[in-house]
Amino acid sequence: LKGNPVGSISPSVDLYNAISLKYALPLGGEDLDAFEGDLRLRITEGGDAFTPLGEGAENDPTLPGELAYVDDAGAVCRCWNWRDGVRTALTDNTGNAFLIVECVDPERIEDCRAATEELAQLVEQHLGATIAVAELITYDHREAIIEP
């Protein structure tokens, strides 16, 4: 950050950005109601439709071998949850949000749990939200059912 303040985006994004900075873990969020079909994290074959936030309305499809969250309509996030797309972006009108904390280092699993718990508490406290599902996805526990 080099001494520069982090700008405000929206209440939900600001909350997960604060937790991301506190725990030094990647966090993200998407509009769950904008998903088409199931969300999957996978290595892409390339060509998944994706319009990135902040760069106009140009389709920028995934590349072969890229790791991305995808649904039946295309890419939701690219490079894990780093590059958000327009189609599923959180807005002031989002009714059901998908918030994610990522951690690929098994040594930091407790940090991941703590970040997830703190994010849930802040979202409930400051946004009046109800947490429907809070699960840790691992190699041995590979999926969660999320129903808005």
Regions found by a protein language model. Name each.
Residues 1-148:
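RNA/tRNA-interacting regions in translation and RNA-turnover enzymes
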